[in-house]
């Protein structure tokens, strides 16, 4: 590991200690709390929309959020490790089969909706849990290879 990558990893770890983001993917509806400075006043502004892309890695990782404001599509790119981002809330999970949802730019109205992912939680549980996957055992891999 070169020294630049090592320094970036240390900075990422330091920022992640201060705040935790939920694990979200393209297709998920998120609410991003952004610190906005107007003159001498600062306030926190909520920006809610569909995450249409995640790109980059390390300190340069970004995600793009698209929303419809007064009939116009508005997209905003947020750096994941920006100090201006106060929090990211996961509003709902979306069921998509693509990593980049740029095709939503050409769709209007009901065609631009994304189906909600069903997670079959028990009654009374709140929030979305991260589903853990188990690695495939070696004997199953050999059966598939034969």
UniProtKB/Swiss-Prot annotation:
Keywords: Ribonucleoprotein, Ribosomal protein. InterPro entries: Ribosomal_bL19, Ribosomal_bL19_CS, Ribosomal_bL19_sf, Translation_prot_SH3-like_sf. Residues 119-146 are annotated as: Disordered. The keyword Ribosomal protein applies. It comes from the Bacteria. One of its GO terms (cellular component) is cytosolic large ribosomal subunit. Coiled coil: none annotated. One of its GO terms (molecular function) is structural constituent of ribosome. GO terms for biological process: translation. Gene3D superfamilies: 2.30.30.790. HAMAP family: Ribosomal_bL19 (MF_00402). This protein is located at the 30S-50S ribosomal subunit interface and may play a role in the structure and function of the aminoacyl-tRNA binding site. NCBIfam families: rplS_bact (TIGR01024). Belongs to the bacterial ribosomal protein bL19 family. This is Large ribosomal subunit protein bL19. It comes from Bartonella tribocorum (strain CIP 105476 / IBS 506). The lineage of its organism: Bacteria, Pseudomonadati, Pseudomonadota, Alphaproteobacteria, Hyphomicrobiales. The gene is rplS.
């Amino acid at each position: 590991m070169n020294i630049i990558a090592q320094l970036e990893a240390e900075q990422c770890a330091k920022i992640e200690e201060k705040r935790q983001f939920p694990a979200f993917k393209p297709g998920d509806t998120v609410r991003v709390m952004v610190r906005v400075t107007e003159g001498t006043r600062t306030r926190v502004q909520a920006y809610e929309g569909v995450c249409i892309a995640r790109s980059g890695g390390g300190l340069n990782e970004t995600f793009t959020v698209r929303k419809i404001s007064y009939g116009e599509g508005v997209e905003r790119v947020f750096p994941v490790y920006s100090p201006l981002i106060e929090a990211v809330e996961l509003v709902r999970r979306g069921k998509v089969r693509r990593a980049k949802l740029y095709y939503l730019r050409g769709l209007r109205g009901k065609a631009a909706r994304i189906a909600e992912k069903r997670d079959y939680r028990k009654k009374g549980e709140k929030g979305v849990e991260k589903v853990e996957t188990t690695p495939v055992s070696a004997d199953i891999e050999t059966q598939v290879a034969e």
